[in-house]
Curated annotation (Swiss-Prot):
MF term (GO), any: heme binding
Coiled-coil spans in chain: none
Species assigned in the record: Geobacillus thermodenitrificans (strain NG80-2)
Gene: chdC
Protein's UniProt name: Coproheme decarboxylase
Keywords assigned: Heme, Heme biosynthesis, Iron, Metal-binding, Oxidoreductase
Database matches in NCBIfam families: PRK12276.1
Record: active site: 144
């Protein structure tokens, strides 16, 4: 039997995609719309306080295309806290006009494929920064879920640890070409959601998403073993721009 990779696990992650019922939103009187926006911004202010205390992080992006209109990406130490945040959002007036489109539950993950040394990894500052990240405030985001293939000779889980480590090392070399251009956060979701991993990319240049994903398709680990779900791409929505976005 092949050896399972050990993982380092950090904050839990929720990608909460919603569509907006603009027709119903437009029917609200101006003062009710403004009250709903103010209530929502008060909730976001609580998220920002949590982030400033480094007890979690969040990002809000408007989604391009018809799959969704807005994304709330939330990181917290526990699954319970994610549920509390989701529930608090759903209780707001604004949520009456935010219809569920897609969601993804996972946990920030680092594998031992690239591990070395005997030091406790949870005590290494760089590892902690990656397990408990403050999300980048870049202009653009790209999210997609993925699996490793399990078909015939292309069964990832039948490869030896050494084979998997070498394939992932080569894959990582491709990713490092985009250092400074793209920030990547990998979240594990085996047993938590429908795919095995979620990949979230951040950049100030959306074209880099296309370049990175395309180049990685030629890595053997992706060409032979990668299976992908839907891709979501969006633009950052800063708190100060929320009133403008929801203005009618």
């Amino acid at each position: 039997m092949s050896e399972a990779a050990q993982t380092l696990d950090g904050w839990y992650c929720l990608h909460d995609f919603r569509t907006i019922d603009w027709s119903a939103w437009k029917m609200l009187p101006n003062e009710e719309r403004q009250a709903a926006i103010d209530e929502f911004l008060a909730l976001v202010d609580k998220w920002e306080t949590t982030e400033s205390e480094q007890q979690g992080s969040h990002a809000i992006y408007t989604i391009v295309g018809q799959k969704a209109d807005i994304l709330f990406m939330i990181l917290r130490p526990t699954l319970d806290e994610l549920h509390e945040i989701e529930t608090a959002l759903n209780k707001t007036k604004l949520a009456e006009y935010l219809l569920p489109a897609y969601s993804y539950v996972s946990v920030v993950e680092l594998s031992n494929y690239l591990a070395s040394g005997n030091e406790d990894p949870y005590q290494i500052p760089e590892v902690r920064r990656r397990l408990y990240p403050i999300l980048p405030k870049t202009n653009y985001i790209c999210f997609y879920p993925m699996d490793k293939r399990r078909q015939g000779d292309d069964n990832w889980y039948m490869l030896s640890m050494e084979q998997r480590r070498e394939l992932m090392r080569a894959h990582g070399m491709t990713g490092r070409k985009y250092a400074g251009k793209v920030t990547q956060i990998i979240t594990g979701s085996v047993g938590l959601d429908d795919f095995e991993w979620g990949v979230t990319l951040f950049s100030d240049d959306a074209l880099q998403f296309k370049k990175l994903v395309y180049e990685m398709r030629f890595d053997e680990v992706s060409a032979r073993f990668g299976e992908f779900g839907s891709f979501f791409v969006g633009n950052r929505l800063a708190a100060e721009n929320v009133p403008t976005f929801f203005h009618i």
